[in-house]
Amino acid sequence: MTDPSVVHARAPAPDRIGRLGAGVRGLMQHAEEAAGLAQRPGLLQGLDPRAKVAGAFALILAAVATRSLLVLLALFVLATALAAASQISPARLARQVWIVVLGFTGMIALPALILVPGTPVLSLPFGLAITEQGLRAAAFLTGRSETTATLALALVLTTPWPQVLKALRCLGVPRAAVMILGMTHRYIFVLADLALDLFEARRSRLVGRLSPAEARRLATGIAGALFERALALSSEVHLAMLARGWRGEVHLIDDFRFRPRDGGALVLAAAILAGVVWAGSVWP
């Protein structure tokens, strides 16, 4: 395995190393901003984490279960309004959720426009046609993805991650699942910190440019060194946590307090879900 600390006669282009490091720093900055946002005054910030998790889950189920585009649009507007009332700007939602989800689900939903049989609304070459049913299927896929992603982001940005994990345990999620979520979240930032150290070490040794083939070999060496260090560190961290009595349960200094407004929010979310399910059974 190539040791990335070895000084080469030439080094990779500064812009390439800079872009990689900037991406890792952007991840760390996003985590800091999210932690700060969870402490701001806002509608969702003032609710009990258990009510937020259960309510978000109910609204996500409603978005998945609805058979009406108007109801789905109303749920999307509700999710956006909840985010805005919690100091999450539409620009942030567009940057972190809407554009990404639209691009990803759009590529998946695009074939449905012509593959779903139905009433043609637009003729295309080679005997193809965009159908009304295809447009409806694509709209449902995109709308459900946008709505559920907006609700999930609003939950995560307004609730510290340890509180989310504890709320999941309080709602009956298995300890193994919560443990996996907690360790995954923690090791993402462990890997990011290690990667940032490697990029900075390489950047300090820049003396020129590498050929594309040499740059790829160097990137492979950095990736291998990162994986090796992360594997060793993860084992050490896990053993240290076990030695300190960690068994997968989430313990916080402050206990949750369920207040009347938390109950009201939970009842409202449950009523929306029940209304969507009832409407779907009455008007299939």
Curated annotation (Swiss-Prot):
Main localization (coarse): membrane
Topology versus the membrane: Multi-pass membrane protein
The keyword Transmembrane is assigned to this record: yes
Transmembrane annotation, as ranges: 57-77, 97-117, 176-196, 263-283
GO biological process, one term: nickel cation transport
Compartment list: Cell inner membrane
Record keywords: Cell inner membrane, Cell membrane, Ion transport, Membrane, Nickel, Nickel transport, Transmembrane, Transmembrane helix, Transport
One CC-aspect GO term: ATP-binding cassette (ABC) transporter complex
Subunit-level organization: Forms an energy-coupling factor (ECF) transporter complex composed of an ATP-binding protein (A component, NikO), a transmembrane protein (T component, NikQ) and a fused possible substrate-capture protein (S component, NikMN) of unknown stoichimetry.
Function in brief: Part of the energy-coupling factor (ECF) transporter complex NikMNQO involved in nickel import. The complex confers nickel uptake upon expression in E.coli; can also transport cobalt with a very low affinity.
UniProt similarity note: Belongs to the CbiQ family.
Protein name as annotated: Nickel transport protein NikQ
Organism per entry: Rhodobacter capsulatus (strain ATCC BAA-309 / NBRC 16581 / SB1003)
Gene: nikQ
